[in-house]
From Swiss-Prot:
Keywords (A to Z) from UniProt: Aminoacyl-tRNA synthetase, ATP-binding, Cytoplasm, Ligase, Nucleotide-binding, Protein biosynthesis
GO biological process, one term: tryptophanyl-tRNA aminoacylation
Span(s) of short sequence motif 'HIGH' region: 14-22
PANTHER family recorded: TRYPTOPHAN--TRNA LIGASE, MITOCHONDRIAL (PTHR43766:SF1)
Protein name per its UniProtKB record: Tryptophan--tRNA ligase
GO CC annotation terms, alphabetical: cytosol
Disulfide bridge positions per record: none
Designated gene of the protein: trpS
Source species: Clostridium perfringens (strain 13 / Type A)
Amino acid sequence: MEDKKKIIFSGIKPSGDLTLGNYLGAIKNWTKLQEEYDCYFCVVDLHAITVKQLPADLRRRTLEVLAIYIASGINPEENTLFIQSHVPAHSEASWLLTCNSYMGELSRMTQYKDKSKKMGDSIGAGLFNYPVLMAADILLYNADLVPVGKDQMQHLELARDIGTRFNNSYSKTFTIPEGYVPKEGAKIMDLQDPSKKMSKSDANPNGFILIMDEPNVIRKKISRAVTDSIGIVNYTDEQPGVKNLINILCAIKGYTPDEVVKMYDGKGYAEFKNDVAEAIVEELAPVQEKVKALLGDKKALEEIYKKGAEKANYAAMKTLRKMQKKIGLIPR
């Protein structure tokens, strides 16, 4: 009998248009996981509304993120692709877990602390409870592994703590997940300020490349990317702008940083930047084409997310019913 595949859960918020960082740092890696694991890839729209969204934009981006998953090579026949709000168990489980969470542990979350410093008392309760919803997302599917970046590791630790606490209080209910850090997978930094991660919420549009950016826009943004006055392509922390561009090229082409440094020995930044830009354009062109085709066939896309929600709902409801029974709620 063949071993049961381990379960992976991951998702992206449709709170902004997706960037090259989302693609190279997450989605491209997910495509490599689908053979080996039973994958649940979600568009986490309920997380997006912790900050007010324009309804039409949220709907557009939710479908676009789903289309990007598929266009990047994630097979909807082999994986469970769905929209978070289409599986009501996420919201229900989140409340049950909220009642097993502590104010202290939630207020210690770095992202919440950073945002509350800026926003004070006007910070939304949704941002405070965000990590509990994330815990529900993961625990509902009994995920073994969760691909996470460093910025989400603290939230995953909390999910583990909440899951363990529930198991200890009510008997074994959840698999306690591990963080999955892929061997490959670059952390792509801001093109204008390489000390921070490339982010779709950046105020300066030259700092990020969107997956759906036109080729000429990509070329322009890379040509304006911050480098330095050294003029030599080196992979070193002293040249963070150049290092970031090397990481982008390596993530796309499969080179090692040393190989890139050798390739551009004696060559200037102009040629190097030009090659990085062309590599990005070449990588994203087929993805963009497929995304446009998928968004042009809303019926086919709807079929995919409805089928995905059905499959996700089946798994999530099994866990939710266990939770309800153990807590003492009367089955409906």
